[in-house]
């Protein structure tokens, strides 16, 4: 065992002991499992999504060991009145399916959950006894388990329905007669509250009948929850086929691309789950594919921050076709609102593309869109898409340029937190996003044959903006040499991390110290503001990327491990979350995209410099000997990056395109290498 491997093991052991974790990564597997013991009662919630519906499952195990659940069903294509941001049809069902069953003419009783696992579906395995035949001599008889039930909950990939597959196995020594009744629960909504009238929400059992179950034999049946317009026929799906399609998406698509391999299984596994959550939540609307943040609120719509800025630049790396299509579609929608007078673009385009929301004014949306569109276009590696997006990038850059204050920073009404916290007349986020967009626009313009004078102007504007950011926002806050979030700001804010992600290093040491200091850092990541209690994962995720970007891999990895362990194996799993207390830590999906970008842009330091080229600045912690990212699908390619530490401290970096000779580089830690993929 090498010294670094020993350090890694000791660190993981110490961190695991620092707080009790509920879940474990299954040995030899990719899923997480909770083996239920004395750590009950416990409650949690998880969101899962398909192309035509989503659900939040509020589930738990009570003090007796019995499972409970409430299904919050969301149907984004069934619009309600008023048809605004939150107008998806939603309905909750807490139907207790096991209570409907009979075994030997008796009801199931005394459930004891054995384990719960999550792997693209939530699977619960429990043991059941049956009721007593009389109240005489059987009064004090301890119930004996006779049935093992495995229920698996998941969304359809393409249909507006939630599926639950139940498998019953006889664990006793005698045959059982199992009764599965015919059952339907049907609700018709008020026609005045639906854009197209009444909707029908229903839950149905499929596979009803009377069955004899020999010892150790199994049978299966299904529960299906769906909604449709009044007068339409309900769907009668093949639930086994729906489950196979869901697992093909999880294992055949998500697990097959952008595979992270490091000495830290917690980070590797959370990265896998974040890929899934980022990619699954895309709705097939009449306005095209739209990535949905989710959270029982945000569907069939797009936002300048969640989609354009956060998740769209990630999709080319994953290579998920629907993800790329949703990204391009979102930029097309924003481009509809370009105007010669340079009035602000809407913050959000809602209701399947039929309406807009701009209730917070200009949040710096043009900077968000320019930053995301330019990065996406470069990483996508498609000249046709880049040419289509270039006018949007140009327009947004000119808009930001026209919003420069006398101090040379970008003015806006607010920021992506929309007034929840003060942001002044010009905030740090908007200016750094504009700066990042200028950096990307230079190589993108060169690729497209834009006049050199225009790209030179963007480069000059970037240099001027970098100086203005330091002059206007830089200063001492809370005893740290860092940034004010806005003019007059006296409290540390988590968004001081933004200059780090765009390569502005003048105050990097003080900023990292401030981010990791007691004023902001908590067990749940960064507080939004010093002295408060509110946290939003998005700023923690940006900060982690930024700390890697400025070469402080050891400090970043310690925090990334702790954060990943809490989100993956703690009491609320398995994805990054939105915020607390707002939203009760909803599993908004774009945050998972930000988690993945910690790895692609932070740990591996990939910065697109062309449609087939990128800068690569690996930031590997001292405790790791090697790390790899396999089947990267960006730049129109399929390639691996492997980083190994050599005896004298240099890094051996291998870039291997599928079917081509690997390219090997050697570099000092912190050095950037220029990679040009084979045309």
Positions of PLM-derived features:
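Gly/Pro-rich turn-and-neighbor structural signature
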Residues: 166, 264-273, 456-475
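Substrate-binding groove/exosite segments of carbohydrate-active enzymes
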Residues: 251-387, 414-417, 488-501, 527-561
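Terminal accessory carbohydrate-recognition/targeting modules of carbohydrate-active enzymes
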Residues: 10, 19-269, 319-320, 552, ...
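Proline-centered turn/helix-capping motifs that create local helix->coil transitions or kinks
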Residues: 282-285, 338-343, 401-411, 471-478, ...
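N-terminal export leaders
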Residues: 3-7
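Active-site core of glycosidic bond-cleaving carbohydrate-active enzymes
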Residues: 303-328, 332, 391-394, 398, ...
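The feature captures the catalytic groove of carbohydrate-active enzymes
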Residues: 212-239, 296-300, 346-368, 398-463, ...
């Amino acid at each position: 065992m090498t010294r670094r491997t020993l350090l890694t093991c000791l660190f993981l052991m110490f961190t695991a002991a620092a707080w009790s974790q509920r879940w474990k990564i299954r040995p030899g597997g990719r899923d997480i499992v909770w083996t239920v013991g004395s750590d009950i009662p416990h409650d949690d919630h998880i969101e899962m999504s398909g192309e035509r519906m989503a659900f939040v499952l509020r589930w738990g195990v009570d003090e007796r060991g019995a499972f409970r659940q409430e299904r919050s069903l969301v149907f984004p294509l069934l619009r309600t009145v008023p048809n605004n941001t939150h107008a998806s049809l939603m309905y909750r069902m807490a139907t207790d399916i096991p209570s409907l069953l009979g075994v030997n003419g008796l009801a199931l009783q005394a459930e004891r959950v054995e384990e719960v696992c999550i792997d693209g579906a939530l699977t619960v395995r429990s043991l059941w006894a049956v009721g007593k035949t009389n109240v005489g001599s059987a009064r004090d008889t301890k119930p004996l388990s006779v049935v093992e039930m495995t229920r698996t909950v998941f969304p359809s990939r393409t249909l507006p329905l939630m599926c639950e597959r139940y498998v019953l196995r006889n664990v006793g020594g005698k045959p059982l007669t199992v009764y599965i009744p015919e059952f339907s629960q049907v609700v018709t909504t008020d026609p005045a509250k639906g854009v197209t009238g009444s909707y029908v929400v229903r839950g149905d059992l499929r596979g009803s009948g009377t069955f004899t179950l020999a010892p150790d034999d199994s049978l299966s049946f299904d529960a299906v929850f769906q909604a449709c317009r009044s007068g339409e026929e309900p769907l009668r799906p093949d639930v086994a086929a729906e489950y196979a399609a869901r697992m093909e998406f999880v294992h055949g698509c998500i697990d097959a691309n952008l595979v992270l391999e490091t000495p830290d299984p917690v980070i590797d596994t959370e990265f896998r789950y974040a890929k899934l959550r980022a990619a699954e939540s895309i709705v097939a609307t009449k306005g095209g594919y739209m990535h949905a943040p989710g959270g029982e609120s945000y569907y069939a719509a797009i936002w300048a921050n969640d989609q354009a800025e956060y998740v769209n630049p990630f999709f080319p790396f994953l290579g998920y076709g629907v993800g790329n299509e949703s990204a391009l579609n979102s930029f097309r929608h924003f481009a509809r609102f370009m105007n010669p007078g340079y009035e602000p673009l809407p913050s959000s385009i809602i209701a399947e593309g039929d309406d807009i929301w701009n209730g917070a004014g200009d949040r710096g949306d043009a900077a968000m869109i320019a930053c995301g569109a330019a990065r996406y276009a470069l990483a996508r590696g498609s000249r046709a898409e880049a040419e289509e997006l270039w006018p949007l990038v140009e327009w947004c850059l000119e808009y930001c340029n026209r919003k420069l204050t006398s101090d040379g920073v970008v003015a806006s009404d607010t920021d992506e937190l929309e007034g929840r916290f003060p942001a002044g007349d010009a905030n740090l986020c908007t200016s750094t996003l504009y700066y990042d967009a200028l950096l990307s626009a230079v190589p993108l313009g060169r690729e497209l044959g834009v006049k050199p004078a225009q790209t030179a102007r963007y480069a000059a504007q970037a240099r001027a903006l970098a100086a203005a950011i330091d002059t206007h926002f830089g200063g001492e806050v809370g005893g740290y040499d860092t940034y004010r979030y806005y003019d007059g700001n006296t409290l540390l804010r988590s968004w001081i991390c933004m200059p780090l992600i765009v390569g502005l290093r003048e105050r990097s040491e003080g900023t990292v110290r401030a981010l990791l200091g007691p004023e902001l850092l908590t067990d749940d990541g960064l507080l939004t503001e010093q002295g408060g209690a509110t946290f939003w994962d998005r700023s923690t995720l940006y900060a982690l990327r930024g700390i890697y970007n400025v070469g402080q891999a050891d400090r970043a990895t310690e925090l990334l491990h702790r954060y990943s362990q809490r989100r993956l194996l703690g009491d609320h799993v398995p994805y990054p979350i939105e915020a607390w207390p707002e939203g009760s830590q909803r599993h908004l999906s774009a945050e998972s995209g930000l988690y993945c970008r910690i790895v692609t842009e932070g740990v591996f330091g990939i910065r697109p410099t062309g449609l087939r080229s990128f800068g690569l600045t690996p930031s590997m912690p001292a405790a790791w000997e090697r790390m790899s990212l396999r089947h990267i699908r960006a730049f129109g390619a399929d390639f691996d990056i492997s980083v190994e530490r050599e005896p004298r401290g240099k890094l051996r970096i291998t870039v291997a395109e599928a079917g081509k000779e690997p390219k090997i580089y050697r570099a000092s830690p912190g050095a950037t290498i220029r990679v040009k993929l084979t045309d």
